[in-house]
């Protein structure tokens, strides 16, 4: 299975730099079996069935972009930092500019309330240990940090305060992600309430999306690719709700690839179980899904692991047809773009 099998031409004009307003006005490509329909997210109330269960990732994006200063004697230098993920040895793994000029033991000052020491430095990133922890760290980061937009948006415009709202889901609870579970950005409170009134169930899980989600695949034989690891949790309650839905004949529908990867990790034995830890599950064609019946997700980058995931769910030829339709009909792509609802079979 070659990387080139997952390539397609995407006009740059289809890369969304702002979301639809309101959130539910985003377009929705409904693909069920061989059928494709052009709908809108607000139409989900009539598409989902009573007894369906949506699995939502309740991670909260932290303001992971920081600008600080490093001082040597009388000289000060500006340093830009993007937090990537908590480090096993303590502190945070981070990218920094200029990385090559930083030295272990140096302190970067981000504000009067937040500083960090360079504990380790590698070829591509470093480990920072902050002078605050817990709630004090969260508060200082909220003051000093900015929302970490995906690179394909940040390359086209500067982040602003509107992104603080746009790049956060309405059910975000547990801080720790440095990228949003973007399919969930399409939901607002009225839509959630309307779906609940229809008899659709909701289960929340937590997967802290890391910066590794944007890393390119660098091998031609995709089966040899190694995924980045991300921390997640499926609680006892969540596992029981999903199991009950399956037993009752309902559909389990993750909202976003992060929720899908997490519940499939928790069902590695064949049945969904409570689960907590790091997952590096890599889903590509040939994978046998254990609990997922359908998926709501945005449109993904060419040659990405997420395109491989949806190809595993729907089949490679079917995904090619779906993406060809999306491009021809001017669907908006990536994090702030439109959505698809992928239902195999039908």
Swiss-Prot record:
Annotated pathway: tRNA modification; tRNA-queuosine biosynthesis
Cellular location(s): Cytoplasm
Keywords: Cytoplasm, Queuosine biosynthesis, S-adenosyl-L-methionine, Transferase
Record-level Gene Ontology MF annotations: S-adenosylmethionine:tRNA ribosyltransferase-isomerase activity
This protein's record includes keyword rRNA-binding: no
Pfam families in alphabetical order: Queuosine_synth (PF02547)
Primary location: cytoplasm
Function of the protein: Transfers and isomerizes the ribose moiety from AdoMet to the 7-aminomethyl group of 7-deazaguanine (preQ1-tRNA) to give epoxyqueuosine (oQ-tRNA).
GO CC annotation, single: cytoplasm
Entry keyword annotation includes Ligase: no
GO BP terms: queuosine biosynthetic process; tRNA wobble guanine modification
Catalytic activity: 7-aminomethyl-7-carbaguanosine(34) in tRNA + S-adenosyl-L-methionine = epoxyqueuosine(34) in tRNA + adenine + L-methionine + 2 H(+)
Family of the protein in this entry: Belongs to the QueA family.
Protein name: S-adenosylmethionine:tRNA ribosyltransferase-isomerase
Assembly description: Monomer.
